[in-house]
């Protein structure tokens, strides 16, 4: 149907229907359109009855070659899809608002509605209109939601499309996750809202279904919708009935008890899983045979990465452009198959914390790179393999077409060659992959022996079954071939008999076969010709002989098409019955694709195999940022070392000017650790990586305007999350803590954060802490495990050169004016800044901080050039009471934090007086 803006008349029609009120018995359709059911036409009564059953969906109601929408659905769809709003006589005084889309293009329109958060119920004609007595029977055959769409054209083949089911019971959460396009299904249980939020951020489902208690659990549902674009639907309580959920799972997996599935101890997880399968059965209207297993997992077995850290580290997409290029995944992904791409993404989003499993992956990569010719040959055989996971899902759904089966067979034909190469490998993981990879030769033979090499896309147009597979198919085809010969002979005889040389036998689906005579020769038409159709320049006729021949030919053709479809459906079902074997093989192919990709990336980029330890040591020599070194074109990336342990080198305070490379250095350390724990080689000369349980980052600053949070509030919220959840096995990347507020507040907060982290009883995490508060370098030697580092800078007169090298010690200058000059700030401003900094140089708060700290080791480096907020308190104020207060301070008994708080209070007093 033509896309266009609604006319004023159409808008008025919609408004009238919204406002109309009927006095007779009514039935409310969707959101506020009363319909007088007593006067509706029979067809519209059926529509309203169906709509009432699926009131939370937009109903696509099949009428001939269109899906039509009526009443409120029509108003919504015409607005969202920008299609014409018309009207339909429905038995009432006013025409019902109506719009429609062609059935052959429906998926495109459905997906546009799904992307906007709507559900769509598809109501099909389930009987042949020619055979129907009265109204054609219609049924809703599927409900499409964001987490249950099957349209491969709209889905990203490199990303799973997850549906998540959550049940909140007391202070616990049950969580089940499924991707119906691949058959994957998992369940877990969590005891805190933050842990649940971490899982949501990890899987980023398209849709969440939940009980009402989840909405009150403390998880910010509005944030899930706004920030992640997740559709959240609360289901009726009966979905979460414990007994019903257990019964549903037992029936689906054909087991007598759930212990056999390994999920018997997951009480809330069982409820979440049962609700998920109830929802899928209701929406999909099918047996879901491809969802043949459910796997329990513990979130504690994977590295925890919160949403902020995922965003800051740009694991799968960049922060600004939201695109793959420029992310870690972009560097690592050289996979050949869609299955491999999805698996690699899951590896990046879920790094391991089991050292033994990590070593297995690293061992597979090492052997693949030791045999590069075999690795490259494997990749060549992987290249033509289609998406086996999503193909078998379509086969199980009975939506796969003949070409899908041919693609499936051509993919399976690659497996024996891959297995032959893998037979020469000895690493445990590659040997396991070879064992799990079933060549599926019986399925290949079935498809190749039954389906033609180039079948049509449609399932009911014939031309599907290979010659020799079925005797009846061959017989009907011969009849059809002979029929064409008979038609040709009849045409020749009629030309001879009538003298009409241009006479032709034509065919169309509506009128069947006919004799076509142009108007020039219609005077020569014999009396036994019966007029059938009038055209602009010709007439079409039928004779008894042609009618008899038509019945014979079309009868054979109809039987042929019906038989071919029946045989194709049977073949498809036979393939679908092997879903477990196929899915296991698909997983093996995907894993092999990932390891071959990671091995190739490691070889091309001079990555090294990291050593994995469980002592907490992180020792990286000449580490490089995996993404930045790919993005810079002509410049050489400057490598840097990182050394962190659980004792004397736990916290590195890093100072230096903006643009010098502090953030890049810290991010590269986090990425190298993460890469090692997904089982990848890393960009360094050598790396000894102690397994970390969590990576937290607090990098950059940005307002969260959508939730009304300032830069500083966002920063403090993230810091609070880190301090609450970091452990002694965590890695923290903290950049410019406290810069979103006043200098004293910011310095105090940053100082207190470092004190908290350094306390092994409270935290003890390994930390890289970048700051402009040079005063924090005073903590070296005073707090256990704190060490100072800075970015080396070379001065050339008034200019500076960033050397991008991390060196021991603290920075002695901020170089703010030089950076401003590099950024293009006007010369007049630069000159005035130089004058001011000289005037303010005596206002050195660092000296005050030094006086307030306890006796300590001699510092190697001093600092100057402080900002306006760091002016001496005594340059302008002569108030005797303030002077007396300072005189009476017992400085030797003050802690650093007490001293800073006193300074802060004194400053406030002065501000209030001036």
Model-derived regions: residue spans:
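Acidic, low-complexity intrinsically disordered tails
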Residues: 1-39, 826, 830-914
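Amphipathic alpha-helical transducer elements in NTP-driven molecular machines
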Residues: 40-44, 60, 71, 100-110, ...
């Amino acid at each position: 149907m033509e896309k266009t803006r609604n006319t004023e008349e159409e808008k008025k029609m919609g408004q009238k229907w919204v406002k109309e009120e009927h006095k007779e018995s009514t039935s409310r359709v969707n959101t506020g359109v009363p319909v007088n059911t007593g006067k509706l036409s029979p067809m519209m009564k059926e529509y309203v009855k169906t709509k009432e059953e699926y009131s939370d969906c937009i109903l696509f109601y099949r009428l001939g070659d269109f899906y039509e929408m009526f009443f409120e659905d029509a108003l919504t769809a015409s607005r969202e899809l920008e299609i014409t709003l018309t009207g339909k006589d429905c038995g009432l005084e006013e025409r019902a608002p109506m719009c429609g889309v062609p059935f052959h293009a429906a998926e495109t329109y459905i997906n546009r509605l799904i992307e906007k958060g709507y559900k769509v119920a598809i109501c099909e004609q389930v009987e042949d209109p020619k055979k129907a007595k009265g109204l054609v029977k219609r049924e809703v055959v599927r409900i499409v939601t964001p987490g249950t769409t099957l349209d491969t054209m709209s889905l990203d083949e490199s990303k799973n499309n997850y549906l998540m089911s959550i049940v909140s019971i007391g202070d616990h959460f049950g969580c089940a996750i499924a991707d119906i396009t691949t058959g994957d299904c998992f369940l877990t249980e969590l005891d805190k809202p933050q842990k649940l939020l971490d899982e949501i951020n990890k899987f980023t489902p398209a849709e969440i279904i939940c009980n009402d208690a989840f909405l009150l659990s403390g998880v910010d549902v509005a944030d899930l919708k706004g920030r992640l674009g997740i559709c959240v639907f609360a289901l009726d309580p009966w979905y979460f009935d414990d007994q019903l959920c257990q019964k549903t799972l037992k029936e689906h997996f054909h087991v007598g008890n759930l212990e056999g599935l390994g999920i018997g101890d997951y009480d809330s997880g069982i409820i979440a899983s049962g609700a998920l399968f109830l929802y899928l059965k209701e929406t999909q209207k099918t047996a879901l045979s491809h969802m043949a297993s459910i796997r329990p997992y513990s979130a504690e077995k994977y590295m925890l990465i919160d949403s902020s850290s995922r965003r800051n580290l740009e694991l799968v997409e960049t922060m600004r452009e939201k695109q793959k290029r420029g992310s870690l995944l972009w560097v690592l992904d050289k996979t050949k198959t869609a299955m491999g791409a999805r698996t690699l993404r899951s590896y990046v989003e879920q790094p391991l914390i089991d050292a033994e499993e990590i070593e297995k992956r690293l061992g597979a990569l090492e052997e693949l790179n030791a045999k590069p010719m075999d690795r490259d040959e494997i990749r060549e055989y992987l290249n033509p393999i289609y998406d086996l996971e999503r193909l078998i899902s379509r086969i199980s759904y009975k939506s796969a077409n003949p070409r899908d089966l041919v693609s499936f067979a051509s993919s399976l034909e690659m497996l024996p060659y891959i297995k032959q190469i893998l037979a020469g490998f000895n690493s445990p993981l590659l040997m396991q992959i070879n064992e799990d990879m079933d060549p599926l030769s019986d399925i290949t033979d079935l498809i190749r022996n039954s389906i033609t090499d180039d079948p049509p896309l449609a399932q009911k147009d014939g031309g599907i079954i290979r010659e020799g597979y079925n005797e009846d198919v061959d017989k009907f085809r011969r009849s059809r071939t002979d029929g064409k010969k008979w038609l040709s002979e009849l045409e020749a005889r009629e030309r001879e008999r009538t003298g009409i040389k241009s006479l032709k036998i034509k065919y169309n689906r509506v009128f069947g076969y006919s004799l076509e005579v142009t108007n020039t020769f219609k005077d020569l038409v014999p009396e036994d010709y019966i007029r059938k159709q009038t055209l602009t320049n010709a007439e079409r006729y039928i004779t008894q002989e042609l009618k008899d021949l038509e019945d014979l030919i079309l009868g054979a053709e109809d039987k042929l098409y019906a038989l071919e479809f029946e045989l194709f459906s049977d073949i498809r079902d036979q393939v679908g019955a092997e879903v477990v074997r196929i899915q296991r093989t698909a997983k093996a192919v995907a894993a092999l694709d990932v390891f071959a990709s990671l091995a190739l990336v490691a070889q091309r980029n001079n990555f090294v195999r990291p050593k994995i330890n469980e002592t907490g040591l992180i020792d990286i020599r000449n580490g490089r940022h995996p993404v930045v070194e790919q993005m810079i074109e002509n410049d050489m990336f400057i490598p840097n070392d990182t050394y962190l342990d659980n004792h004397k080198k736990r916290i590195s305070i890093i100072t230096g000017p903006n643009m010098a490379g502090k953030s890049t250095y810290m991010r590269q350390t986090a990425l190298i650790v993460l890469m090692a724990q997904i089982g990848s080689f890393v960009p360094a000369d050598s790396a000894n990586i102690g397994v970390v349980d969590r990576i937290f980052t607090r990098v950059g600053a940005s307002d969260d305007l959508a939730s009304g949070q300032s830069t500083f509030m966002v920063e403090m919220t993230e810091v609070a999350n880190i301090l609450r959840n970091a452990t002694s096995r965590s890695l923290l990347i903290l950049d410019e803590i406290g810069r979103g507020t006043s200098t004293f507040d910011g310095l105090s907060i940053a100082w207190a954060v470092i004190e908290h982290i350094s306390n092994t009883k409270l935290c003890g995490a390994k930390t890289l802490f970048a700051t402009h508060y040079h005063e924090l370098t005073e903590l070296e030697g005073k707090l256990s495990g704190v060490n100072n580092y800075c970015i080396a800078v070379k001065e050339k007169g008034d200019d500076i050169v960033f050397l991008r090298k991390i060196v021991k010690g603290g920075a002695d200058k901020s170089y703010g004016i030089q950076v401003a000059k590099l950024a293009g700030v006007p010369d007049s401003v630069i000159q005035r800044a130089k004058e001011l900094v000289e005037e303010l140089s005596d206002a050195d708060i660092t000296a005050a901080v030094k006086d307030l700290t306890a006796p300590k080791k001699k510092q190697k480096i001093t600092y100057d050039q402080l900002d306006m907020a760091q002016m001496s308190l005594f340059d302008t104020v002569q108030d005797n009471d303030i002077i007396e207060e300072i005189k009476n301070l017992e400085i030797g008994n003050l802690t650093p934090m007490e001293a800073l708080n006193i300074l802060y209070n004194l400053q406030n007093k002065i501000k209030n007086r001036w």
